[in-house]
Amino acid sequence: MGLSDGEWQLVLKVWGKVEGDLPGHGQEVLIRLFKTHPETLEKFDKFKGLKTEDEMKASADLKKHGGTVLTALGNILKKKGQHEAELKPLAQSHATKHKISIKFLEYISEAIIHVLQSKHSADFGADAQAAMGKALELFRNDMAAKYKEFGFQG
């Protein structure tokens, strides 16, 4: 399941583009997530009142949270699979407080890949997409394992 050094390089190259505007990318990812899987919006009390894409785009809180999400993910990706210290508190909060299912992590992974394809197509060809898919799958699998440690089947 692990990624090769070359695959990690592809992941981190495109992630460097994301880091140029974490809040903007994060906002787009969350909007994509909420549009394609509206049930995920119910997990965010702060955003439940946002009914249209225009309302979502105008929300400073949504943009801020998007930046928070992608900052945390970036910190995990940069560890190239050696992310135990970064993953544990994230898994604990998502399992015990937020109750975010692994299925929802799959949905946000799809949204991330979609946003990267649309914003960075030159740096996100088939090889980079496959590598990012593997990196996000590794993240989800490790989150699922941690969830079980916290007694959440997610």
From Swiss-Prot:
Domain Globin, chain residue ranges per copy: 2-148
Keyword terms, alphabetized: Cytoplasm, Heme, Iron, Metal-binding, Muscle protein, Oxidoreductase, Oxygen transport, Phosphoprotein, Transport
Location(s) in or outside the cell: Cytoplasm, Sarcoplasm
Modified residues (Phosphothreonine): 68
Residues found modified as Phosphoserine: 4
List of residues binding O2: 65
A Pfam family per the record: Globin
GO BP annotations listed: oxygen transport; removal of superoxide radicals
InterPro entries reported for this sequence: Globin (IPR000971), Globin-like_sf (IPR009050), Myoglobin (IPR002335)
UniProt binding sites for heme b: 94
Source organism superkingdom: Eukaryota
Residues that bind nitrite: 65
Catalytic activity as recorded in UniProt: Fe(III)-heme b-[protein] + nitric oxide + H2O = Fe(II)-heme b-[protein] + nitrite + 2 H(+); H2O2 + AH2 = A + 2 H2O
SUPFAM superfamilies: Globin-like
Molecular function terms from GO: heme binding; metal ion binding; nitrite reductase activity; oxygen binding; oxygen carrier activity; peroxidase activity
CC terms in the record's Gene Ontology section: sarcoplasm
EC number(s) reported in the record: 1.7.-.-, 1.11.1.-
Keyword Transport: yes
Subunit structure: Monomeric.
Role description: Monomeric heme protein which primary function is to store oxygen and facilitate its diffusion within muscle tissues. Reversibly binds oxygen through a pentacoordinated heme iron and enables its timely and efficient release as needed during periods of heightened demand. Depending on the oxidative conditions of tissues and cells, and in addition to its ability to bind oxygen, it also has a nitrite reductase activity whereby it regulates the production of bioactive nitric oxide.
Stated family: Belongs to the globin family.
The protein's name in its UniProt record: Myoglobin
Gene: MB
